[in-house]
Amino acid sequence: HAFLDGRDTPPASAKGFVETLENKMAEIGVGKVASLSGRYYAMDRDNNWDRVEKAYDSLVTGDGIKAESATQALQESYDNGKTDEFVEPTVICKDGQPLSLVKANDSVIFFNFRPDRAREMTRAFCDDKFTGFERKTGFIPLTFVCFKDYDESIPNKKVAFKKEIIKNTFGEFLANHGKKQLRLAETEKYAHVTFFFNGGVEDPNVDEFRLLVNSPK
C-alpha cells in the first residue's frame, strides 16, 4: 500500500518509483502494489479526518477509485491534473476484486520515521476507542509496527526503533568546555538547530544562546 509524496519530491515522480518497485517485486516473486493514496489523504496532520477516512477505507474495505495497475492509476491521475500529493485513494484490483486488504490479525509495518504525518493513520488503525470517523468494520486487531513511536498516547502498536538518549552532543561538549554558542535560524529551521541538534532536548545548554528570525510569508 503506497502513500505518495509529491511535495518533498518532484510532483510526478511516483510513477517512476512505482515502476522500479514493481519490477523488483516481479524479479523476486514477492509482493504487489495493492493501493495508492496521496499524502493529502493518507498523511494528513491537521485532523482532516474526512481525508484520512478515504485512505483508510481504501486499505480496509476496498472503497475508492478502482484500477488494474498502479502505473495505470498514476497515469490516469496525472492526465486528470492530480499529481502525487493529491492522488485520490485508489484500489488495485484483479478480476474486479482488490489485490489485498488489511484484515484482522494481519501484520502491518508503517515505513515512516517522521511522526507528524503518520499519527492520524496509525491512530485510526490502533486506537480501539478511535472517534475520528466511523470505521465500517470496527476496530481491527493487528500487529501494527511503527518505525518509531509516533505518539505515546496511541495504544496497541509496536515500535521498531525506540528513541535513544544521545549523550555528549556537540552542544554539550562545547558547554562542558566553557564555550559559548549561538543557534541562529529562521522560523522553518529553528527546531533543527536547537531541539534536533541537541539530540531531542528542548532546554538549551549552559551559555547556549538562541536567535529566531521570522521566515518570510
Q: What is the predicted function of each stretch?
A:
Residues H1-K217:
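Feature captures the catalytic ectodomains and active-site-proximal regions of enzymes
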